[in-house]
Amino acid sequence: MISAAYAATHAAAEHAQSGMPQFDSSTFSSQMFWTVISFVALLLLLKKFVVPAISDVLEARASRIEEELKAAENERKEAAALLVDQRAEVKAEREKIAQLLESARKEADALREQEKAELEAELAKLKSQATQDIEQARRQAMSEVRGVVVEVALAVTEKLITKSIDKAEANKLADEAIRHLEANKDQLH
């Protein structure tokens, strides 16, 4: 039995030597020591070189993001101010255009009224002139008709009554005939 126990432990020792050294219990203490030393050295190296570099990068990135946010906020404020200014300018331009349109409309109305008044005055003048021309032509025609009527009346009267009528009597008869014609001129047409 002893030899069987010896053989089992010897086989386990051989197996441990031929296997992974991490599982060899005789080297646990030295492995733990060097693992702790390596870990502490790694932490010190990380703290000394890597963490400050990462911290600097993160701080730089944070400050850059903060600056970009401030710049974006400033640009937003400027854009809002520009928008307000643009809206005010657009409103002012619209009011100006409305005033120009109203002024142009009033000016066109005034010009139209002036042209209308001038045209009406010209038409009244032409009507008055035409009325005067017609009246003058009527007088002239009546004068010519009167002369012809007097002569015809004289000739007819002389032939009818074989009595001579003087010029004054003939004018009186002609005036009477003309008054009769003027009074009945609507019936003649």
UniProtKB/Swiss-Prot annotation:
**Superkingdom of source:** Bacteria
Q: How does it sit in the membrane?
A: Single-pass membrane protein
GO molecular function annotation: proton-transporting ATP synthase activity, rotational mechanism; proton-transporting ATPase activity, rotational mechanism
Keywords assigned? ATP synthesis, Cell inner membrane, Cell membrane, CF(0), Hydrogen ion transport, Ion transport, Membrane, Transmembrane, Transmembrane helix, Transport
- Record's Gene Ontology CC terms? plasma membrane; proton-transporting ATP synthase complex
Q: Where are the transmembrane segments?
A: 32-54
Principal localization reads: membrane
- Where found, per UniProt? Cell inner membrane
Q: Which InterPro entries match?
A: ATP_synth_b/b'su_bac/chlpt (IPR002146), ATP_synth_F0_bsu_bac (IPR005864), ATP_synthase_B_chain (IPR050059)
Q: Which residues form a coiled coil?
A: none
Kindly indicate whether the keyword Cell membrane belongs to this entry.
yes
Please indicate if the UniProt record lists Ion transport as a keyword.
yes
| Protein family | Belongs to the ATPase B chain family.
Please describe what this protein does: F(1)F(0) ATP synthase produces ATP from ADP in the presence of a proton or sodium gradient. F-type ATPases consist of two structural domains, F(1) containing the extramembraneous catalytic core and F(0) containing the membrane proton channel, linked together by a central stalk and a peripheral stalk. During catalysis, ATP synthesis in the catalytic domain of F(1) is coupled via a rotary mechanism of the central stalk subunits to proton translocation.
Q: Which PANTHER family match?
A: ATP SYNTHASE SUBUNIT B, ATP SYNTHASE SUBUNIT B', CHLOROPLASTIC
SUBUNIT field: F-type ATPases have 2 components, F(1) - the catalytic core - and F(0) - the membrane proton channel. F(1) has five subunits: alpha(3), beta(3), gamma(1), delta(1), epsilon(1). F(0) has three main subunits: a(1), b(2) and c(10-14). The alpha and beta chains form an alternating ring which encloses part of the gamma chain. F(1) is attached to F(0) by a central stalk formed by the gamma and epsilon chains, while a peripheral stalk is formed by the delta and b chains.
- The molecule here is called ATP synthase subunit b
Q: What organism does the record attribute this protein to?
A: Magnetococcus marinus (strain ATCC BAA-1437 / JCM 17883 / MC-1)
